[in-house]
Amino acid sequence: MAKGFTFKQFHVDDGGCGMAVSTDGVLLGAWATLPKQGKLIDIGTGSGLLALMMAQRTAPAPCSIIAIELDDSAADAAAKNFSNSPWSSSLHCVKQDIQQWNRTQPKNNIGNIICNPPYFNFGLQADSQTRATARHTDTLTHDALLQSITHLLAPEGIVSLILPEYEGRQLIQAAEKYGLQCQRLCEVKSTEKKPVSRLLIELTSSTVKSAPQKEALCIHDSGQYSAQFIALTRDFYLKL
């Protein structure tokens, strides 16, 4: 039996990656606004899940998707997953730190960026170095991430992210210092009675200021996946 996770149109082998395929990643990949044209960058691609999801969603009008990954094992896994997918010609994995790669790129040339960033600050580390790198901001602080985004993002460009609620609201505040504003925000709960656990965040470099479009999503309803969750993710999960 193949290792990893099989979706409707592709398979993700996440062995050796710091973070396995997760609901967070699937939510972000299904929710993110599609690029209108040009390149899409996936920062910290891990196993390549987000890049693959965006490749599936943009397949009718393919765009170039560049996935950046610092960890050697994860980058190798992503490259293999890309080559085994139906969209191998559109997917490219770069094994490099985003800040180093950033220095080789022209300013304000990327229309769409997607990222499931690390969110734990210093303190208790994960049970392996690879997992720690994927989950902790020690190797990529949110300020460093925002600096890279500001350099890369084209005028009117869009950035899509997912974070725990507290870290997400902190990042939205920090983004304002870099000329990025939140234009779309989805509060995610596991059930209606639970507190908000995740924020799906869309930032833009647009200079037109307005209140963000607010959305809400409950993953479960009466012990089953909710109609909202099924509608959002049914193009990917095999059993939906």
Curated annotation (Swiss-Prot):
* Enzyme Commission numbers on file: 2.1.1.223
Name the Pfam families on file: MTS
Signal sequence extent: none
Q: Which GO terms describe its cellular component?
A: cytoplasm
- InterPro entries reported for this sequence: DNA_methylase_N6_adenine_CS, SAM-dependent_MTases_sf, Small_mtfrase_dom, tRNA_Adenine-N(6)_MTase, tRNA_adenine-N6_MeTrfase
Tell me a Gene Ontology molecular-function term this record carries: nucleic acid binding
Gene3D superfamilies named in the record: Vaccinia Virus protein VP39
Q: Which GO terms describe its biological process?
A: methylation; tRNA processing
What this chain does, per the record?
Specifically methylates the adenine in position 37 of tRNA(1)(Val) (anticodon cmo5UAC).
HAMAP family under this entry? tRNA_methyltr_YfiC (MF_01872)
The UniProt entry's sequence similarity note says:
Belongs to the methyltransferase superfamily. tRNA (adenine-N(6)-)-methyltransferase family.
**What's the name of the protein?**
tRNA1(Val) (adenine(37)-N6)-methyltransferase
Protein species of origin: Photobacterium profundum (strain SS9)
